[in-house]
Amino acid sequence: MKFFHLSDLHIGKHLFYYSLLEDQKYVFHQILEAAKEEQPDAVLLCGDIYDKTIPSAEAVSLFDWFLTELKETLPKALILIIAGNHDSGERLEFARELLEKEGVFIAGLPPREADEKIRKVTMTDPAGEVCFYLLP
């Protein structure tokens, strides 16, 4: 199996009052090109998706665009997303159940109840099985 691992995207970040959104979109285009060429079986987005717990509308739109393009580029690949300390876990989990039907798994919050378990996602191919435990 082949995986892409991305983290600390910080979508919506500003440096000295300069928005990095255009630069981030350029990087996402590069990632999409690499995904098209390499055809990973899963893409892991591990923490700090956004730069702020309440991201701008433009940052949310850019991430929406990226996920849509990524899924169109890799229709069979799993996309696994966990929140980081810059993210709002509750907001990141928006439409979680709907997205799972499309192979996009999101864990924004750790287990909250004693009987709750860490989210487990399993992939299988001819070589065997891989289990991912989504713990933000």
Where are these regions (language model features)?
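Metal-dependent catalytic neighborhoods of phosphoester/phosphodiester hydrolases
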Residues: 16, 49-67, 83-102, 106-108, ...
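N-terminal active-site segment of His-dependent metallophosphoesterases
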Residues: 1-68, 75-76
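Conserved catalytic scaffold of divalent metal-dependent phosphoesterases
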Residues: 98, 102-136
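Divalent metal-dependent hydrolysis catalytic cores, especially in the metallo-beta-lactamase
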Residues: 80-83, 135-136
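Glycine-rich loops and low-complexity Gly/Arg-rich segments
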Residues: 28-31, 67-71, 104-108, 130-131
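Residue-level detector of flexible, active-site-proximal loop/helix-junction positions
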Residues: 10, 86, 113
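Short helix-capping segments at alpha-helix termini
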Residues: 71-74, 99
